[in-house]
Amino acid sequence: MHEQYQPLEIETQAQNYWKEHQSFLVRELPDKEKFYCLSMFPYPSGKLHMGHVRNYTIGDVISRYHRMQGRNVLQPMGWDAFGMPAENAAMKNNVAPAAWTYDNIAYMKSQLDSLGLAIDWTREVTTCKPDYYRWEQWLFTRLFEKGVIYRKNGTVNWDPVDQTVLANEQVIDGRGWRSGALIEKREIPMYYFKITAYAEELLESLDNLPGWPEQVKTMQRNWIGKSRGMEIAFPYDQASIGHAGQLKVFTTRPDTLMGATYVAVAAEHPLATQAAQNDPQLQAFIDECKRGGVAEADIATQEKKGLATSLFVEHPLTGDKLPVWVANYVLMNYGEGAVMAVPGHDERDFEFANKYGLPIRQVIARVEGENDFEPTVWKEWYGAKDESVRTVNSGKYDDLGYQAAFDAIGADLEAKGLGQARTQFRLRDWGISRQRYWGCPIPIIHCDACGDVPVPAEQLPVVLPEDVVPDGAGSPLAKMPEFYECSCPKCGQPAKRETDTMDTFVESSWYFARYACPQFEGGMLDKKAADYWLPVDQYIGGIEHAILHLLYARFFHKLMRDEGLVGSDEPFRNLLTQGMVVADTYYRTTANGGKDWFNPADVEVERDAKAKVVGARLKSDGQPVEIGGTEKMSKSKNNGVDPQSMIDQYGADTCRLFMMFASPPDMSLEWSDAGVEGANRFLRRVWRLAHAHVSAGLPGALDGASLSDAQKQVRRAIHLAIRQASQDVGQHHKFNTAIAAVMTLMNVLEKAPSQDAQDRALLQEGLETVVLLLAPITPHICHVLWEQLGHAEAVIDARWPVVDESALVQDTLQLVVQVNGKLRGHIDVAASASREDVEAAARANENVLRFTEGLSIRKVIVVPGKLVNIVAN
């Protein structure tokens, strides 16, 4: 055993052992309890960042801990390999996205290996490979035939120069991110998953996920957005519109119907189209609306604009004529593309009515307090629907609470055939068509005679050609007759293959299930294997995936269940959302007002007595730089630390130890070079103590029955550490406090005597405990130390240590003694001492006698096992 800790040598040795012995290969073992631990798989962007390292280390610690508990542990890894960044990189470097992606995968896989992750690589999935996406295509065809997937026109951002559809985030200030062209809204045919058919179940079954953070469940509940309301029909005013008909709106506030003063429709609504025929100003406004963003978030923040039409509808209860406006905040794909406006009691309508001088009618008043309704100043209570308000100015519906008004107005609308109660969801069907190249081809053939025909199972997969370099102008597949020319599977006539590809969220919605049977060729899943491993016992990933990915994965799991592929209802039993990795930022302001960001490694900092950074200068020129505070590591702020350079300098175990010690996993982790140094120093201490112990020769067995009091204290420290770490790692995932417990134990072991055989046997137990408790966190050093401590089996196959309760029993206790709440001394008493004995010992303490001299002792408070407080005056 080397005297010095040499991480590179140690880590190579451990990793070679795991490879040779296939230590992480797992099979289904029906008689053994399974544990499936999964970290969200990475996008192969080129190299790992610290966020990846943290995510995968957390998963690895949990996996290794459960293996030490005797469970059959699966920890797989794969690559979320389709997507826009590959196309962008391909255009930039003039290389096919496939080649770029596979190169990145090879490099990142070597990085993951260097971290020492206990991954079963035989189960690796790569989502851009046909053997993976073929089953996605198969499920698509099944769901299309069942009507769970359908085709309809959808509104998209169209770049007229690049002739392509842009994602919302690619539209910057109304222009295309690449071409700079003004973006148009266009209607194009797209495929949709009918996720709304599962909205109720997706909402209800959140209650069956006690192992999920409440915050994530709340975000999903809000996204699904169940609301009870009414669909209300406003009859057309035939004099202005020219024909009979109804304008339908959904509202959660039918109780305020008597306050409706106008209606607003989306730019794409048929009434808007009709009104614009002889109104060039309105047509120009509609065109402007169509150019705007299609994202809900954009619409929420943009300025509310509208234009009146010459059309009217009738109020369903009073018959009053209400003007029809076209407004940019009404979305065609929400409800029927129309809203009833009650400016007195809806903040958005209130702003709009004040802007355009529309009437504002109060129909709700406060029950108590001042009824201070002002039509020019919005107040929070205007929108209330609780017991604090009642209806007013509503004729026969006056003086009713929200529910009573809802029911009374609803009943009258239903009687007139102009309303019906309805539950609506904010959730929209999931449009998955992408006019992109680097994605999974949609398995549909368009035939003039037969319509949209799913590709038959025996003709799957529809393979994406991999030798294409996109140019950014439209989809390359649409320009490749060799891809799209085909014959119809039904009638045999010439037909055209679909050239859109699927949203990349589809691949990440079922990968967790394919890991159970990645080589299975008989179907999407081998049900027996899938039911053995699923659901995932512990899923780990960032909170930013709380809605889309986690909702789509839950939806897909239910689709697979309904196809008979899996037996469970939910994919992930427990969810851990890890915090971000943050680091200091430094910059200089440029002449044009921009910022040049400098990497922390290139900056020298000056700290105050509390180690706070108070000054910074660039190493290269010695000139000051501004301190920007701590932010998430990112390329844009140039504050990332390359994991590879850290591993090369200190070893993977140091990086892993720092990551787990610096912060609880669900909190942000602040990068600190001093913290990394500290972690490395601690591992060197462990190595040094073990080296000294092993060099003196391994001891015989410990005789627990004949320990001295001092030895009992050492053994107690060992088992206190086991108890603490078992709770922290096993129950709470507080790896930082588990490591702190091991550090406390190390302090005891370093000071413990090693003269006689019992001392050395006790040190052996202490070092073995340190190694076992650290094994999930720093597996390489523990692999070597376990072997050096005389064990034939590898630590990867060792069991987690068990607390010996008898070691925690104390013969004597040391108690704190206070006089009037101030510390005045300590006393040693027998663990079995009575309250009277404890009080007598405290009163006899010489310091107590000194501080109570001339005073009367009023009472003595004894907190068993902790302290005695003597109150005297």
UniProtKB/Swiss-Prot annotation:
Mind telling me which GO cellular component terms the entry cites? cytosol
List UniProt keywords, sorted A-Z: Aminoacyl-tRNA synthetase, ATP-binding, Cytoplasm, Ligase, Nucleotide-binding, Protein biosynthesis
Q: Highest taxon of the source?
A: Bacteria
Q: Where is this motif: 'HIGH' region?
A: 42-52
Q: Where in the cell is it found?
A: Cytoplasm
Reaction(s) catalysed (UniProt annotation):
tRNA(Leu) + L-leucine + ATP = L-leucyl-tRNA(Leu) + AMP + diphosphate
Top EC class per UniProt? Answer: ligase
The sequence motif named 'KMSKS' region is recorded at: 632-636
What EC designation does it have?
A: 6.1.1.4
Residues that bind ATP: K635
Which PROSITE patterns does this UniProt record tie to the protein?
AA_TRNA_LIGASE_I (PS00178)
* Family matches, as InterPro entries: aa-tRNA-synth_I_CS, aa-tRNA-synth_Ia, Leu-tRNA-ligase, Leu_tRNA-synth_edit, M/V/L/I-tRNA-synth_anticd-bd, Methionyl/Leucyl_tRNA_Synth, Rossmann-like_a/b/a_fold, tRNAsynth_Ia_anticodon-bd
Task: State the family it belongs to.
Answer: Belongs to the class-I aminoacyl-tRNA synthetase family.
NCBIfam families xref list: leuS_bact
Which HAMAP family does this entry report, sorted A to Z?
A: Leu_tRNA_synth_B
UniProt-recorded name of the protein: Leucine--tRNA ligase
Give the species this sequence originates from: Pseudomonas paraeruginosa (strain DSM 24068 / PA7) (Pseudomonas aeruginosa (strain PA7))
Recorded name of the encoding gene: leuS
